[in-house]
């Protein structure tokens, strides 16, 4: 049986106890208790806080479905960092400690599931190829599992996520098999599956036996744009995505787009770079000359697109945050500037996924996901548990998100 739940990560503009109340009143069976630096911070939680949460849950109809240890927890501008596979042991231990605190809170509240994410390959991994990130991740998971006592019914879950080291269900299932513990399983996010699996319906069915918990949100097609560092062996597939190539010697960027190639610069472009640009574009049969755009003239302030662009940029692996931050005004320019036809150069949200579906959590019913087929695939493959709506992009419109999600998803579960 699949039961609907709602994550407090989408209700962070109120007190934690109030969040439990509104989910309860909305009719959900469960609630995900998500760590948050300002709302439910495990480093600040007192025994009195735990007692108050426990008392609230005992008097409500809603049940605690899972403790989420909040990938975004530590540094707002650099979410997911440090991760369980950070090269610096101090960083890994910070994340391990957070997951262990999740297990401790779950123990005190009688919750049986605790979830986390793998983290991303970052520039530190690229610059240290002798270090195996999978080994670091596995060592960290084993360390977290030590926190679970032999007589406890607590399971640790990993959530595959677009762009992360563990991104697809195949990667997730392989990791579960290799960890080889009955206390370690999968947490599937249906939006992530839509982004990362060519046949997400079949993938849901295949992964169901490994899965103890679900996240739910909607999503839709975007403009797939890959940011990559310039290298001689780069290969481009314009049927899959457009590319924004970063040149480390000048910190310039080349947009490889068949309709409107562009070169973003802030110093005069030397002849050898112009020749290189032409060679790259010619290699993918782009005959148009790249427009030169002065980076220093790009608007770099706040825009209504900030949330969308931030979500996109933090999902790009293998590059430093400085490279990604420097790309932000470029993405804003492409999304907000109109071409000769009166349309934005990038007329859909930016995606960095395996399918072109945007990793942006939409309210169920406002995207293009097939929820009927998705839930059928899970049920037919014996999944039973909570499906928690996670809408952290809709905190300001939480009432609509809470009610519309329940109304739409109740048709299918």
Annotate each PLM feature.
Residues 17-36:
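Catalytic domains of carbohydrate-active enzymes, especially glycoside hydrolases
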Residues 2-8, 31-33, 64-69, 114-116, ...:
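Hydrophobic faces of well-ordered beta-strands that scaffold small-molecule active sites
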Residues 34-58, 118-125:
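Glycine-rich, proline-tolerant flexible connector loops at the mouths of alpha/beta enzymes
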């Amino acid at each position: 049986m699949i039961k609907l739940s709602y994550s407090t990560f989408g209700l962070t503009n109120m007190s934690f106890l109030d969040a439990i109340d509104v989910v309860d009143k909305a009719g959900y069976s469960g609630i995900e208790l998500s760590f948050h630096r300002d709302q439910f911070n495990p480093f600040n939680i007192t025994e009195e806080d735990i007692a108050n949460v426990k008392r609230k849950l005992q008097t409500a109809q809603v049940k605690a479905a899972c403790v989420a240890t909040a990938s975004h927890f530590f540094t707002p501008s650099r979410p997911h960092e440090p991760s369980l596979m950070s090269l610096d042991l101090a960083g890994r231990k910070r994340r391990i400690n957070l997951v262990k605190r999740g297990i401790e809170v779950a123990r005190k509240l009688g919750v049986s599931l605790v979830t986390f994410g793998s983290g991303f390959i970052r520039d530190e991994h690229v610059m240290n190829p002798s270090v195996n990130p999978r080994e670091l991740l596995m060592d960290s998971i084993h360390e977290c599992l030590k926190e679970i006592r032999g007589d406890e019914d607590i399971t640790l879950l990993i959530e595959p996520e677009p762009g992360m080291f563990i991104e697809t269900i195949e990667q997730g299932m392989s990791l579960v098999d290799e960890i080889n513990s009955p206390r370690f399983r999968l947490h599937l996010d249906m939006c992530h599956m839509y982004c990362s699996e060519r046949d997400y319906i079949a993938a849901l069915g295949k992964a169901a036996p490994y899965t103890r918990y679900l996240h739910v949100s909607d999503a839709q097609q975007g403009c797939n744009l890959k940011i990559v560092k310039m290298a001689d062996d780069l290969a481009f597939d314009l049927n899959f995505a457009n590319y924004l190539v970063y040149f480390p010697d000048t910190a310039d960027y080349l947009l490889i787009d068949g309709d409107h190639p562009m070169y973003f610069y802030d110093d005069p472009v030397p002849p050898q770079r112009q020749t290189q640009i032409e060679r790259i574009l010619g290699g993918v049969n782009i005959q148009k000359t790249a427009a030169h755009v002065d980076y220093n003239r790009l608007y770099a302030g706040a825009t209504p697109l900030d949330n969308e662009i931030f979500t996109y940029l933090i999902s790009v692996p293998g590059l430093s945050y400085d490279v990604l931050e420097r790309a932000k005004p470029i993405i804003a320019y492409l999304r907000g500037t109109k071409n000769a036809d009166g349309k934005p150069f990038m007329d859909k949200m930016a995606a960095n996924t395996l399918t072109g579906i945007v990793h942006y959590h939409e309210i169920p019913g406002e995207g293009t996901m097939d929820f009927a087929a998705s839930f059928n695939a899970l049920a037919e493959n014996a999944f039973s548990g909570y499906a928690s709506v996670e809408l952290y992009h809709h905190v300001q419109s939480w009432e609509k998100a809470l009610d519309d999600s329940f109304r739409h998803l109740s048709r299918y579960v």
